Amino acid sequence: IAKMEMICEKLQLERGMKVLEIGCGWGALARWMSQRYGVSVTGITVSKEQAKLARSRCAGLPVSIELADYRALNGEYDRIVSVGMLEHVGQKNYRTYFAKARSLLKDQGLFLLHTIGAGRGGFATDRWIEKYIFPNGVLPPADALAKTAGEFFTIEDWHNFGADYDPTLMAWYENFNRSWVDLKTSYSDRFKRMFDYYLLVSAGSFRSRENHLWQLVLSADGIAGGYRPSRWSASAQ
């Protein structure tokens, strides 16, 4: 809830706005934005399972969940948000991604991009995580992200709160192990070892500051008078 509320504050949502969510997942953010802020939301995903559940969660709200590729979209939106999707775009497609987002955003609109980022070593791909958790996932380094985003947008704000991801992942690890007594009839011990390893290695990568968690707020041509960012820690709520 804290993460969703921080996103909404940074987007400076107003009732009646049209919002596009690129990579809407299971529909939680789309529902939150619509219920709390009175905006209409178009959410897109390439997963049939996600689309089905998201539509169920958002039933009765001005939310449209579409099974679509972002490259095929048309229209114009006051706000765009994309959470945890850039990691799956691929570095060769960054220009296409940002160019399409710019074409969909109104001139005075805002685009919030939420992504895990790599440290100083350049684009990061872990072979084990790619095989078992996130196929074809790539983490962008800051310089590549700034260069490509900056071709199409003004970077109004760049928030790094990766240190907060460490306690989040540890909480997931504890919840997973606490629930294992109910889950073990459906999953193997091998799966448990795999997921334990994933959660702990990921927590370590953020604790060591090897990986980062970024939220960028982008505008089309710069906000007149400047953008006033929301600054609070999601882990503190």
Describe these PLM feature segments.
Residues 54-55:
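Conserved SAM-binding loop
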Residues 26-37:
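Conserved SAM-binding loop of SAM-dependent methyltransferases across substrates and taxa
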Residues 108-116:
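Conserved beta-strand signature within the Rossmann-like core of class I S-adenosyl-L-methionine
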Residues 95-107:
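A short glycine-rich, Lys/Arg-flanked "PGG" loop and its adjoining helix->strand segment in the class I
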Residues 16-23:
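Conserved class I S-adenosyl-L-methionine
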Residues 60-70:
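Conserved SAM-binding strand-loop segment of SAM-dependent methyltransferases
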Residues 116-225, 234:
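Substrate-binding/catalytic lobe of Class I Rossmann-like enzymes that use SAM or dcSAM, i.e.
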Residues 71-80:
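A short acidic, Gly/Pro-enriched loop at the edge of an enzyme's catalytic core
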